[in-house]
Amino acid sequence: IDPLTILKILKGGLKSICKHRKYLDKACASIGQ
């Protein structure tokens, strides 16, 4: 497998994780209360 392809996939994964971070933070906050 091409290392560049792996990097692209990792970057894409990080972007989607960051996108979901907002929702995760809200969920964690509501659970913590």
UniProtKB/Swiss-Prot annotation:
Keywords: Disulfide bond, Secreted, Toxin
Span of the signal peptide: none
Organ and tissue specificity: Expressed by the venom gland.
UniProt KW Disulfide bond keyword: yes
Sample GO molecular function, one term: toxin activity
Predominant cellular place of this UniProt entry's protein: secreted
GO cellular component, one term: extracellular region
Subcellular location(s) of the protein: Secreted
Assembly and oligomerization: Heterodimer composed of subunit A and subunit B (DELTA-PSDTX-Pp1a); disulfide-linked.
Note: Electrospray ionization experiments give a mass of 6598.6 Da for DELTA-pseudomyrmecitoxin-Pp1a heterodimer (subunits A+B).
Biological function: This heterodimer has insecticidal and cytotoxic properties. Induces immediate paralysis when injected into blowflies (Lucilia cuprina), and then death within 24 hours. Also inhibits the growth of Aedes albopictus mosquito C6/36 cells.
Protein name: DELTA-pseudomyrmecitoxin-Pp1a subunit B
Organism: Pseudomyrmex penetrator
